[in-house]
């Protein structure tokens, strides 16, 4: 079956074709980054209007890539939520209208479930079960995944998402939009331990996380540097050092919490998905991850166990239509009820946890 996937939850318009027998056939994406940069952030009305302009050309581009026609489409999947209301409505309206015209089923998909399953698009796929870290601008959650549609929420950020903390910290440092990626780039030139920031909740017994306090620690450091220099500008090397210290703190917290999740579940496979999954430091740290099974006092320590870690291909870390087409195809194959026009801008992942 050939499933058309449509993603329009924020500032990327993604369209893709996934074949249940042949895999991903085509993937087209338009980012609105340049358009929103002028405003220092996403403008919802502009995002919605741009999605409307892009959906038809992107669909036709995907069909051309795959050597297919509208008549070959067996189902249409779209992001129902969460996201910006107007942006979601643009994708939902198009998906439902197209499905109606083609007399094909329409499949609503949870945006985060799309991210959760995106590593399954890679050539080397993880086996179930696994611990999933969903880490993006809007969400930071740790899930136990036992199969398609079989998810359990283990922990999440109680305030800012990790990606949101990256973007807000970048803004504090005067970096251009989108700041998170620029912060990561500058962190490569930062000196280790020139600054040391707290690792909030890293030692808590649960799997909850917090990043707002870390952002405050950066603000305090920035204000101190400016006061010492008697100027608003931050020296280039100092800025890079702050970027590195911030990034190291975030990655340390994420790694520590995922290790606790592995010990809690007994799983030895990790999947990292979402925009922050493209971060080089995070990939390096998780790629070398091991877990140490606790031993009773006085007993020999168990040897460390290597963890298998999977990331989606870089093209599928950010929002994209491929993950929506794939998730839709998986649900269609399991006989999920289809057909939905409404959108859900606020849609907790816990509501689809089985």
Swiss-Prot record:
Binding site for substrate: 134-138, 167, 180, 279
Catalytic activity: L-threonylcarbamoyladenylate + adenosine(37) in tRNA = N(6)-L-threonylcarbamoyladenosine(37) in tRNA + AMP + H(+)
Its EC number(s): 2.3.1.234
CDD domains xref list: ASKHA_NBD_TsaD_bac
Keyword Metal-binding set for record: yes
One Gene Ontology CC term in the entry: cytoplasm
GO BP: tRNA threonylcarbamoyladenosine modification
Predominant place of localization: cytoplasm
InterPro entries: ATPase_NBD, Gcp-like_dom, KAE1/TsaD, TsaD
Cofactor list: Fe(2+)
Subcellular location: Cytoplasm
Keywords assigned by UniProt, alphabetized: Acyltransferase, Cytoplasm, Iron, Metal-binding, Transferase, tRNA processing
Chain positions recorded as Fe cation binding sites: 111, 115, 319
Record's cofactor remark: Binds 1 Fe(2+) ion per subunit.
GO molecular function, one term: iron ion binding
Function comment: Required for the formation of a threonylcarbamoyl group on adenosine at position 37 (t(6)A37) in tRNAs that read codons beginning with adenine. Is involved in the transfer of the threonylcarbamoyl moiety of threonylcarbamoyl-AMP (TC-AMP) to the N6 group of A37, together with TsaE and TsaB. TsaD likely plays a direct catalytic role in this reaction.
Protein family according to the UniProt entry: Belongs to the KAE1 / TsaD family.
HAMAP family found in the cross-reference section: TsaD
Name assigned to this protein: tRNA N6-adenosine threonylcarbamoyltransferase
């Amino acid at each position: 079956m050939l499933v058309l996937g449509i993603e329009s939850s924020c500032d990327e318009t993604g369209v893709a074709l996934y074949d249940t027998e042949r895999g991903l056939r085509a993937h087209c994406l338009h980012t609105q980054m340049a358009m929103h940069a002028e405003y220092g952030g996403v403008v919802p009305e502009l995002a919605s209007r741009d999605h409307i302009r892009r959906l038809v050309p992107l669909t036709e581009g995907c069909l051309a890539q795959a050597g297919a026609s509208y008549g070959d489409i067996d189902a249409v999947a779209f992001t129902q939520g969460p996201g910006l209301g107007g942006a979601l409505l643009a994708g939902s309206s198009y998906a439902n209208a197209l499905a109606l015209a083609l007399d094909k089923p329409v499949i609503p998909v949870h945006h985060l479930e799309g991210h959760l399953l995106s590593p399954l698009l890679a050539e080397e796929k993880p086996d179930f079960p696994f611990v999933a870290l969903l880490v993006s601008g809007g969400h930071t959650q740790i899930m136990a995944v036992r199969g398609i549609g079989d998810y359990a929420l283990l922990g999440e950020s109680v305030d800012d998402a990790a990606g949101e903390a990256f973007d807000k910290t970048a803004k504090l440092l005067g970096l251009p939009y989108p700041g998170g990626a620029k912060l990561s780039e500058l962190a490569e030139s930062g000196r280790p331990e020139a600054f040391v920031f707290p690792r909030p909740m890293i030692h808590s017994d649960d799997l909850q996380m917090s990043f707002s306090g870390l952002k405050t620690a950066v603000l305090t450091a920035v204000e101190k540097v400016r006061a010492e220099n008697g100027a608003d500008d931050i020296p280039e090397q100092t800025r890079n050092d702050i970027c590195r210290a911030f990034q190291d703190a975030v990655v340390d917290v994420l790694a520590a919490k995922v290790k606790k999740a592995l010990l809690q579940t007994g799983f030895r496979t990790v999947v990292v998905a979402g925009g922050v999954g493209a971060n080089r430091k995070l990939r390096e740290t998780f790629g070398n991850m091991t877990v140490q099974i606790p031993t009773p006092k006085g007993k020999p320590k168990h040897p460390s166990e290597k963890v298998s870690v999977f990331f989606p291909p870089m093209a599928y870390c950010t929002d994209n239509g491929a993950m929506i087409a794939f998730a839709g195809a998986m649900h269609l194959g399991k006989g999920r009820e289809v057909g939905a026009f409404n959108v859900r801008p606020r849609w907790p992942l816990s509501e689809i946890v089985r």
